[in-house]
Design a protein with these regions (language model features):
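Alpha-amylase-like alpha-glycosidases and glucanotransferases acting on alpha-linked glucans and related
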Residues: 1-5, 12, 18, 55-199, ...
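Catalytic domains of carbohydrate-active enzymes, especially glycoside hydrolases
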Residues: 2, 27-52, 295-297, 442
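N-terminal catalytic cores of NTP/NDP-binding nucleotidyl/phosphoryl-transfer enzymes
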Residues: 8, 12-31
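Surface-exposed amphipathic alpha-helices with a cationic face
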Residues: 37, 206-214, 339, 363-364
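Outer-envelope exported proteins of Gram-negative bacteria
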Residues: 47, 219-221, 225, 299, ...
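Conserved, well-ordered alpha-helix/loop/beta-strand core segments that scaffold catalytic motifs
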Residues: 195-228
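Structured C-terminal cap/extension of enzyme domains
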Residues: 459-505
Length: 505
C-alpha cells in the first residue's frame, strides 16, 4: 500500500493518562483521539495490545489474538452497571502517576474484573429471552471460536497451577490429553467463562473506540509481533506451528544478532515457526491471525519484517544470541497467501536491523513501506536514514519505542562530531530548539507518512524512554501527563504538519 502524504503520533495505550494505573480504552483514549484530530493528524500508532507477561513486554504476549485485560476501562464497566465507583476508585494503583506499576495491576486489577463478572452472571444472557445482553455475548464467542476456547483454557489452567509456565503443568494437561482437558473444563467451567468475559469486554470497548476514531478520521495503526511467547496459549495449543520436540519444548528460539541496540544480540526466546508446516497448510494460521488484526486495526505494522526473509535461529539453552545462525524464511509465499485470502494488505514493514540484499528485495517485491529512523542517521556518512534520502514509500520516525527519546538521544548519546553534523544538517537554532528542529526535518522529508512519538512532541527526557532492548527491567512504564496535552500543543503540531502538507487542510 502507499499512503497519501500525512502524519501521525505513536502513543501506546498503556501510556495514555488517566486514573487506575494504566491507559485504558474509555475516556483517556477518546480524549487522545480528539487531541489527534485537533492536531491535524491522520494516524494513531500503538504498540501490540495483547496481554503482557514476561517483563511486561507487549512483544511477549500470552496470545496472538487476545486483548490486554488491563486496558479495559473501569468507568465504562461502571456505566454498564457491572461495577460501582467504590469497587475501584479508592484503590491505590501505584505511587507514581507517570509510570505503570505492573505488579500492582497484577495484584489488584483482576479482583475488580471478577466483581464485574459476578455482576454479569446475575444477568447472563439466555437465548430467546430479552436481557441487557441479547446477542453479542454469543456472537463474540462464535466469531472468536478459532482462538478463544484454547486461550480461556490456557489461562484457567495457568491460574490453577500458580501461574507457572505451561511447561511446568501436570503432564496430562501439558500434553493436552483429551480426558484431562475434559475433566478440567467440567470442574472449572465458570473460570473459563470468566476469561471469556474479560475478552468480551475488551472486544466491546475496543470496537467502540475504533468506531469513534473512524468518526474523527483517525486511522489506528496496530502492531503485530512476528513471534509469539514460549509461554502462550498459541504455543501450548498449537505446537505443530513451531519447531518443538515431543514435549512441546522449543528446539531453537528467536532473537537477532549483535547490532546497534545490543552488543550480545537480543535473545528473545520465542519459539520459531515450522515454516514447512505453515506452507503445507496454506498459511492458514497466519491468515487467521492477520484477518483478526485487520478486523481491529486499519493499518498493521509487522514487527521484525526481515524475519520473513531470513531469521536468526539460536539453539535452545544459549544465554546470549551470539551463537545463532541465519535460516531461510517463507518470503513472498506467505504474503501471496495473505493477499489471496484477504485482498489488499495495509502493512508497514519494520525493516530495521541487519539488512541483506534479499531483505531489500522482499520489501520491494511486497510493495510495503519500510521505516526510516532519524536517530540512526548521523554516522558521518550519507546514511539512508538522513531525510534527503527517504523514498516516498516509507514511514519516517525520529525514533521508535526501542530508541531513546529524541531529547535524551540528542543530549546524551551523540558524540560531539555527530551533534555538530545534526546541528549543521538541520540548521538547528536555540530559538527553535533542537528537538523541534529535528522534528521539522522528519516532517519535511519526502516520506509519505511521518510518525512522531508523543514523548518527542513533549520533549520528554531519557527517563521517559519506553524500552531499552536487552534490558530486562524498568521498560514499558512511561505514561503521559494529561496537563501537557494542551490545545496550544495541538495547534503547534497542526501548524508544523500543515507547513509540510501532511494534513487534509
Amino acid at each position: 500500500m502507499e499512503f497519501k502524504r500525512c502524519s501521525g503520533i505513536l502513543m501506546p495505550i498503556s501510556s495514555l493518562p488517566g486514573g487506575y494505573g494504566i491507559g485504558s480504552l474509555g475516556k483517556p483514549a477518546r480524549d487522545f483521539v480528539d487531541f489527534l484530530a485537533g492536531a491535524g493528524q491522520t494516524i494513531w500508532q500503538i504498540l501490540p495490545v495483547g496481554p503482557t507477561g514476561f517483563a511486561d513486554s507487549p512483544y511477549q504476549s500470552c496470545s496472538a489474538f487476545a486483548g490486554n485485560p488491563y486496558f479495559i476501562d473501569l468507568d465504562l464497566l461502571a456505566a454498564d452497571g457491572l461495577l460501582t465507583q467504590k469497587d475501584y476508585a479508592n484503590i491505590n494503583w501505584g505511587s507514581d502517576a507517570a509510570k505503570v506499576d505492573y505488579s500492582t495491576l497484577y495484584e489488584k486489577r483482576f479482583a475488580v474484573l471478577r466483581k464485574a463478572y459476578a455482576n454479569f452472571l446475575k444477568r447472563r444472557p439466555v437465548p430467546g429471552f430479552e436481557t441487557p445482553y441479547p446477542d453479542d455475548w454469543y456472537r463474540f464467542q462464535f466469531l472468536s471460536s478459532n482462538w478463544l476456547p484454547d486461550y480461556c483454557l490456557y489461562m484457567a489452567i495457568k491460574e490453577a497451577n500458580g501461574m507457572v509456565d505451561w511447561q511446568r503443568w501436570p503432564r496430562a494437561l501439558r500434553i493436552r490429553e483429551p480426558e484431562a482437558l475434559a475433566a478440567f473444563r467440567a470442574e472449572h467451567a465458570e473460570e473459563l467463562e470468566f476469561w471469556a468475559f474479560v475478552q468480551y469486554e475488551f472486544d466491546r470497548q475496543w470496537r467502540a473506540l475504533h468506531a469513534y476514531a473512524k468518526q474523527k478520521d483517525i486511522a489506528i495503526m496496530g502492531d503485530i509481533p512476528i513471534y509469539v511467547s514460549a509461554d502462550s496459549a498459541d504455543a501450548w495449543a498449537g505446537r505443530e506451528l513451531f519447531e518443538t520436540d515431543a514435549e512441546g519444548r522449543p528446539r531453537r528460539v528467536a532473537g537477532c544478532p549483535p547490532d546497534y541496540f545490543a552488543e550480545d544480540g537480543q535473545l528473545w526466546g520465542n519459539p520459531l515457526y515450522d515454516w514447512e508446516y505453515h506452507s503445507r497448510t496454506g498459511y492458514a494460521w497466519w491468515i487467521s491471525r492477520v484477518r483478526h488484526a485487520l478486523s481491529i486495526y486499519d493499518i498493521l505494522r509487522i514487527d521484525h519484517f526481515r524475519g520473513f526473509d531470513t531469521y536468526w535461529a539460536i539453539p535452545a539453552g544459549e544465554t546470549t544470541a551470539r551463537n545463532g545462525r541465519w535460516e531461510q524464511g517463507p518470503r513472498m509465499e506467505l504474503f501471496r497467501a495473505l493477499h489471496n485470502a484477504l485482498g489488499s494488505l495495509p502493512i508497514v514493514a519494520e525493516d530495521l536491523g541487519e539488512m541483506f540484499d534479499s531483505v531489500r528485495e522482499l520489501l520491494a517485491e511486497s510493495g510495503f513501506p519500510g521505516m526510516k529512523v532519524l536517530q540512526f542517521a548521523f554516522t558521518g556518512e550519507d546514511s539512508v536514514d538522513l531525510p534527503h534520502n527517504y523514498p516516498r514509500n516509507c514511514v519516517a520516525y525520529p525514533g521508535t519505542h526501542d530508541n531513546n527519546t529524541l531529547a535524551g538521544w540528542f543530549a546524551g548519546e551523540l558524540t560531539a562530531a555527530q551533534r555538530k553534523q545534526a546541528t549543521d544538517y538541520f540548521a538547528l537554532t536555540g530559538r527553535e530548539g533542537n528537538v523541534r528542529g529535528l522534528l521539522r526535518g522528519v516532517l519535511a522529508s519526502a516520506a509519505a507518512l511521518a510518525i512522531i512519538p508523543l514523548a518527542d512532541w513533549l520533549e520528554e527526557p531519557a527517563a521517559s524512554r519506553m524500552n531499552t532492548p536487552g534490558k530486562a527491567r524498568d521498560n514499558w512504564q512511561w505514561r503521559a501527563d494529561a496537563k501537557k496535552l494542551t490545545p496550544a500543543l495541538a495547534g503547534e503540531i497542526r501548524e508544523l504538519s500543515e507547513r509540510y502538507f501532511r494534513t487534509a487542510r
